[in-house]
Amino acid sequence: MLSPEAERVLRYLVEVEELAEEVLADKRQIVDLDTKRNRNREGLRALQKDLSLTEDVMVCFGNMFIRMPHPETKEMIEKDQEHLDKEIERLRKQLKVKVNRLFEAQGKPELKGFNLTPLNQDELKALKVILKG
């Protein structure tokens, strides 16, 4: 039987470990999805170089190659890219929340600048106008 102090420390360590595992799992998933996104980008680039739109192309699905029409293949890869972009963005947002919870559990201050978001095109144009003018 553990003392109340030892139980409290044990609960704290378990909580921190669980949060850290979630952070690491999300990071790993982001890396895996980014790798897939890069492979898709390579495939799209190869399709752009191949100017014969009438011929079918060979596409690898897992461990199987399938012959598909060029336009359908390009459209399918582009849709997959959009899905991967959305999934990676969702995971990154989740990761920020999980890292903040982990830091909070450890008693560390929140990361400065961690919640920054990039400027969109309109904001960037407005900033350039202000700086020039």
Curated annotation (Swiss-Prot):
To which protein family does this belong? Answer: Belongs to the prefoldin subunit beta family.
Q: Where in the cell is it found?
A: Cytoplasm
Write down a Pfam family by its short name: Prefoldin_2
Q: Which UniProt keywords apply?
A: Chaperone, Cytoplasm
Show the InterPro entries listed in the entry.
PDRG1 (IPR030482), PFD_beta-like (IPR002777), Prefoldin (IPR009053)
What's this protein's name?
Answer: p53 and DNA damage-regulated protein 1
Example GO biological process term?
protein folding
| Highest taxon listed in the record's lineage | Eukaryota
Q: How does it assemble?
A: Component of the PAQosome complex which is responsible for the biogenesis of several protein complexes and which consists of R2TP complex members RUVBL1, RUVBL2, RPAP3 and PIH1D1, URI complex members PFDN2, PFDN6, PDRG1, UXT and URI1 as well as ASDURF, POLR2E and DNAAF10/WDR92.
Organism equals: Bos taurus
Recorded GO cellular component terms are: cytosol; prefoldin complex; RPAP3/R2TP/prefoldin-like complex
Function per UniProt: May play a role in chaperone-mediated protein folding.
What GO molecular functions are on record for this protein?
A: unfolded protein binding
